[in-house]
Amino acid sequence: MTFTPATGTESCLSAPSPGNGVGPLQRKIWTATGKADSVDSEEEGQDLESHRPQGQMGNNKSCPGQECSSRFLPAEQAEVNRLFDALSSEKLGSSASPRSFSLQALKGHVGDALPPEMVTRLFEGMRRVDGSGKAKGPSERVSQEQFTASMSHLLKGTAEEKSLVILNMISASGGPVKARDVHKFTEDLVGSVVHVLSYRRQLRGWSQKPPPGSPSRVQVLAAQLCSEMRLQGGGKLLGPQWLDRDCDQAVLEDWVFRAHHVATFLSLVIHQGFLLLRSSLKLATLVPERQVDPQREFASVLDVLSVIYVNSHLPQERRLSWRLLFATELHGNSFAQLCGRIAHGGPCLVLLEDSDGHVFGGFASCSWEVKPQFQGDDRCFLFSVSPRMAVYTCTGYNDHYMYLNQGQQTIPNGLGMGGQHGYFGLWIDVDFGKGHSKAKPTCTTYGSPQLSAQEDFQFQKMEVWAVGEAPKAESVRKTRSILDIDPEARALLEASGRGRHSEGLREVPDEP
């Protein structure tokens, strides 16, 4: 079988662009009855995160392997072929095709890079693809046609094509599955991401596991991804009562479209687990580099999964690196230290862990300034990491995105995001270690619920991470007090008769 590569320029993490010569794709997926359900999907050449793919059900013939593989560039197709040659090189008896590979061969190639359960799921998904349209049932081994078609669907396919492979990774029958089976698949997928990143030494400085005593972030992120699913009848997978509901291919297709992390994680598992087409994986924007002074390491409340999740909601240009600006473990429980380290430090993430173990925070889209007015813009958001993962974006109700003030008698002193004075979605008081998260029922600015375990909370751990490239004023910020940087704040303090006392807010700066 000869596989003809395309001449287009699309990435392995995106759908093919229109006009690249790829026609409608049709393929058959075997069901429990032994009959094939034909499925057509028309390539729309659109970004899956902004346009829903238009799939149609029909009875057309399945595509030949050449059409499936035509999505790969010449160099990519050659790499896919080389991997198949390596997998199918085992010596076989006369009864087996020499151009196919077994589950054992795939496990031997992957080794310990992926959990065995995920390798088995991938093999099951591949062997049930009928690339020729002539098979009478699922094969025991994976042919070159099946392998190429599967890689094409998972790395470059539409939400419909991905959902068909996922369905066969979950179910031996290829038919509808229970929501609990989708949930288990999602946990396996998320766990495989952590596993392979750790195995390939691609954690980029982040911890593989959350701090001791924290809920499993694998389970927390899997629950978040599953909550994006819309079950038959319109319900969401938000609790145990929904686990016995049926999920057919249409439900999975809609889910893959909504929860874009599913497709991203599948691509990551293939790229890093199979060592296939790794140059096309934008790992740097998926897992930001953790930048902390090696002489001043500390135990963060974050792990790699929570970082991946929050990072995916940042503006694209802010996803490459996170630089530590402030941590209570290093810089103490001081509001003055906090202000001095974050003011004019560029866009950043503020997060803390309350005394009940809830981890939450907010993204400040621009530099913090000490002043009595609200600041920021609609790129800001609030988020939760534990016990649940969620991001809450602006509602448009008001512009109370960010607030930072100190030394005033008639207006609140502290750091706040969303809501209003005395009723913030997230508030850190100048009396450091205290705060509140008020939302009845939700924060007006961000639509977020109460983020902390208690409305008024206490905390011991707080971190602030600058995201993306450092601002040009970074060197100024490092050498000057917040009272020097913000003349308005100093003038207000002096006008209130607190000018000399404000000098006491200066603290001997720690080592950066």
Regions found by a protein language model. Give the residues of each.
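Phosphate-recognition beta-domain surfaces
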Residues: 58-98, 105-130, 146-154, 168, ...
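Extended, amphipathic alpha-helical coiled-coil scaffold segments used for oligomerization/tethering
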Residues: 135-138
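A positional/structural detector of protein chain ends, strongest at the extreme C-terminus
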Residues: 1-4, 510-512
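A short alpha-helix capping/helix-loop junction motif
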Residues: 159-166
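N-terminal alpha-helical scaffolding segments that mark the starts
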Residues: 2-3, 8, 12-17, 21-111
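Non-catalytic localization and substrate-recognition regions of ubiquitin/SUMO ligases
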Residues: 141-143
